Amino acid sequence: MEPAAAIRSALAVLQRPDDVLPVYFLTPAVSVVVQTVVTGGVAVAMLYLWATSRLERVLAALAGRELQPPPPDAPAEAFDEWAASIAPALEPVATPVVALVAVATVLAAVVVFAAVVVAVTAAQLSACHGRLRDRRGMTAAVRGVGRFWTSILLVRVLEVAIWAVTVVTALATVAVALLAGGLVGVFVSIVVVPAATGVLLAARAVFAFTVVAVVVDDVGVGDAVRGTLEFIAVNPAAAVAYYVLAAVGVVGLSALAVLLAIVGGAPLVTVLGFAFVAPFLDLVKTGLYGGHRGTVSPPAAPDERLVARLGRGLRRGCREAVTFVRRAPHLHGLAAAILLGGGVLGWWSAGPFADAVSTSIAGRLADHEPVTATATFAANNWTVAVGASLGGLVLAVPAASALLVNGVVLGVYARTEEAPLELLAFVLPHGILELPAIVVAGALGLHLGVVAWRSWVGNDSEALAEELRRAFWVLVGLGVVLVVAAIVEGFVSPYYYRPFL
């Protein structure tokens, strides 16, 4: 397949989004799953400190101390003095058990991150290959996780090993040469650094297609590497075209991230990355390699105009969201209870620090700019909703954890706010939309956890695939709600109450 044809095929697939994008919505779910591991580690450490009365000693030692850190523009000495005043009170926390829990949590988070990323990659590439064969992408994705997970993991391990050996060898060679001194050290550095960089880039270029070869050819690591090298040798122009396209995508997103970091709205880059750039690039490289192997027959692009499809999709998303709320009231009740329980926990846990630490909604709104704030709120809140929902696929635990943590944060802010009435006035207009959306997203995560468990026990991949498609449309509907909430939060909530308070 020629690069132009691969690009057209990718765009055609993306115009029917519900059979490929759901697995790319798993990208923000990865961080939610890892955060759940970290939250569990923190909970274990806190329970240990409570059971051994160390937590009580810490709270007693902190009583009466200045817990509010100096402002960011304060001299460095002020931070040093503040840290020195706090450190003795935290000494009961420094125990071997807490250290062991911290190390175990970090290791568990790394392992879980690697496992989830590999599983998500297998699902994404399987969905791409399935759609490019004009088959059901979600069904291919669900089946592909178990089929290709191990091989893709080994591919990633091999690539990391090559990078590690190359970097260590280059650093050791340069260090020895520089210790020898003179022009020899400089010459060796000039030669070794570019050579090592070339090896790293070559490895990345090969392994970019190797994971695709695992899925398209249904082979192990060795055959996938050989297939990739053959593809690059036979189709160098196609491979280079993909590398250029990928570089443009990465550089473009990076430049946009820098720009939006300055003017505001940086979370938009995250949404653009997982909702368009990543699936587009994966579809292109899968089309190129699959075309080389003769395994793809891309679907035709729909005849309907893009604007009409977009409007129809938004309406369908709203309908699916309403339907989901109506057919799962028990899950929404449970999700609301978890969120409320988190709020109570946050309020209670912040009690000992309420007099020493304060937050201010007025301070947070001091530099408020409505347009960029609206974009930031919409993109960030929807990304959180997507992550919490699809993170629920891991037995619903990450979805419940996300609800609990959000509740805790809300409770802490409410307890430590300097002007509670002002905070309530600010939250009320957009909160009547945003908080129910959070509950629906959490309920969707709980639902997907149950479906995933039943699918695994009953070996029913089609049922899970269908629920993933439906979840995609529910999240589209939640996106509409959260955009409206963001507009209210950006343009109404910070201003309407000021004449009255």
For the regions a language model picked out, list residue spans one by one.
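Hydrophobic alpha-helical membrane segments
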Residues: M1-G351
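C-terminal transmembrane helix pair
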Residues: P28, L435-A485
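Transmembrane alpha-helical segments in integral membrane proteins
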Residues: T105-C128, A205-F209, V384-V408, V440-V451
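Membrane-interfacial helix-loop-helix connectors in multipass membrane proteins
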Residues: L171-A195, A257-V269, A356-R364, Y413-V427, ...
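Alpha-helical transmembrane segments of helical membrane proteins, especially in multi-pass transport
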Residues: A241-V250, G392, P429-L448
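Transmembrane helical segments that form the transport core of multi-pass membrane transport proteins
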Residues: G346-V405
